[in-house]
Amino acid sequence: MIEVRKEIRIAGFGGQGVILAGIVLGKAASLYDGLYAVQTQSYGPEARGGASRAEVVISDHEIDYPKVQSPDILVAMSHQALLTYMDDLKRGGALIVDPDMVVEAEIEDFIRAREVKYFRAPATRTAEERVGITIVANMVMIGALTEATGIVSVRAAEEAIKDSVPPGTEEKNLMAFQAGRELIMEGSR
């Protein structure tokens, strides 16, 4: 049997919930989809506004090397994150960006040259308009990621969200997740 290993990098800045998004993705894969998953994170010393990155490796076999080297999927929630990490993305990989937070004109050549599957998910705006709070933009991105790539099942993602977010916020986070899925279903490419 061929081993399937997928590497995902979610990046943005502190305060966007990047780390929680990585935790949700890892839990969805390992606890609810029955796969192996490793999640790592890094962030700058700033409480808010500094660089933030979550990485998840998902496999159907035990994971012997937990670091993401060349992600199959990059989720960029800020322009700086996009510029910092886009060159690592595998040829033909999936790139999901918040178009309100990045300068898309700067990456058009990259997308063509690398044959990237490109998805636009205006997570911050969608969180504000559909849920009423921007803090759930990370779950909008998890919804977009789930719908665009199928990396985890919808059910697993929903269970992981309920298991990971602060008590009392489950409904808003699930609304944000669904809104993110709908962005992809509606062709926000």
From Swiss-Prot:
Please list the reactions this protein catalyses.
2 oxidized [2Fe-2S]-[ferredoxin] + 2-oxoglutarate + CoA = succinyl-CoA + 2 reduced [2Fe-2S]-[ferredoxin] + CO2 + H(+)
Q: What is its EC number?
A: 1.2.7.3
Source taxon at top rank: Archaea
- Which keywords fit this entry according to its UniProt record? Oxidoreductase
InterPro entries according to UniProt: 2-oxoglutarate_synth_KorC, PorC_KorC, Pyrv/ketoisovalerate_OxRed_cat, Pyrv_flavodox_OxRed_cen
What does the record list as coiled-coil region(s)?
none
Q: MF terms per GO, please?
A: 2-oxoglutarate synthase activity
Assembly information from the UniProt record: Heterotetramer of the KorA, KorB, KorC and KorD subunits.
- Which NCBIfam families did the record assign? PorC_KorC, PRK08537.1
Report what the protein is called.
Answer: 2-oxoglutarate synthase subunit KorC
From which source organism is this entry?
Methanothermobacter thermautotrophicus (strain ATCC 29096 / DSM 1053 / JCM 10044 / NBRC 100330 / Delta H)
Gene that codes for this?
A: korC
